[in-house]
Amino acid sequence: MSVKLEGVELRRIAMPLVSPFRTSFGTQTARDILLLRAVTSDGEGWGECVAMSDPLYSSEYVDATADVLRRFFLPTLAASTEELQRHGAHAVNAVLHKFKGHRMAKAALQMAVLDAELRADGRSWARELGAVHERVPSGVSVGIFDSIPQLLDVVGSYLDAGYVRIKLKIEPGWDVEPVRAVRERFGDDVPLQVDANTAYTLRDARHLAKLDDFDLLLIEQPLEEEDILGHAELARLIKTPVCLDESIVSAQSAAAAISVGACSIINIKPGRVGGYLEAVRIHDVAAAHGLAVWCGGMVETGLGRAANAALAALPGFTLPGDISASDRFYRTDITAPLTISEGYMDVPAGPGLGVSPIPELLDAVTTSSEWITL
């Protein structure tokens, strides 16, 4: 479907978290989020940029994404009307390919244009991506705490809420003992995995092998994102399956990592890889090689959460993702809250994302807004 893009609104919002979320690279108490509203001749669509306030998870950060959109991406789209009219949202990343990196900014822009296109055509996000399930299992990510009793209380509350999989954030000094405590308290039947966010080196292999005793689903991104060969060596030294997150930025990088044995599982985060269309390609590459994938989260609002649920409904997503309910991170979301029932979240079935910002809720958290005519 063709798209005639008239302009894009860049809207910044400030979303306080219900509780601090600590990982190996820092602690978040609020999210500074850039939203994009793409206006076309047929309607509008929404995109959410997952870049954080500081370049800690990746090299991108929210001020930089707004800048690159304003100075480079949007003017380039404005000069590419023929491609957009011919190929719609599928042309966005092709048009922007000459610009190096900035995948989170590209993903947000593609998301907004695709949402507008699908809403105008009456098609759902899930149908466009190739979803085969109407609901998806919901896992939850649990941060680092000051004490093990705190951790156990939080894990227990999430299990009581129905989450079907627990992911523990780990770092040196907070790894084996927290995992041991969770296993001892809640048993071996709870699907459990850990996420290091690049906090270790290959010299820690013997220590990480101690996690083999706990029958974990996986250990996620233990080493630096560029250390593909190190991950391949680690995978040979430990029994716990190695999953890559930060290292996977495209279908090409996924194929390369798979070819050297650096992982047996991939966490697909659409923002990290340049958008949902590239996320589908990574899913296809993994499926062709017999690897499981799952959908990671970036503390999204209901917009990104709905899109992720649709992605997680593709056939190759065989492990529960970080598709948690809105109230996991936000007391009040900007959309109608996404909820879980008996451990599952329904995949939105309406046109486009299937959810929209509620104007009064969006206005209440908006810190700035800029309209750019194309």
Model-derived regions, located:
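N-terminal capping/lid subdomain adjacent to the active-site entrance of alpha/beta enzymes
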Residues: 2-193, 197-202, 206, 210-213, ...
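Short, solvent-exposed coil/turn elements at secondary-structure transition points
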Residues: 11-13, 144, 248, 271, ...
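Short amphipathic alpha-helical face segments that pack within enzyme cores
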Residues: 108, 112, 281, 302-310
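A generic structural signal for well-ordered alpha-helical segments
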Residues: 117-118, 235, 286, 312
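Structural signal for conserved beta-strand scaffold positions within catalytic alpha/beta enzyme cores
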Residues: 140, 267, 322-325
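Catalytic core of soluble alpha/beta enzymes
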Residues: 168, 173-304, 333, 340
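Hydrophobic alpha-helix feature that most strongly marks membrane-spanning transmembrane helices
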Residues: 287, 291, 307, 313-316, ...
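Active-site pocket-lining/capping segments in soluble small-molecule metabolic enzymes
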Residues: 299-342, 350-352
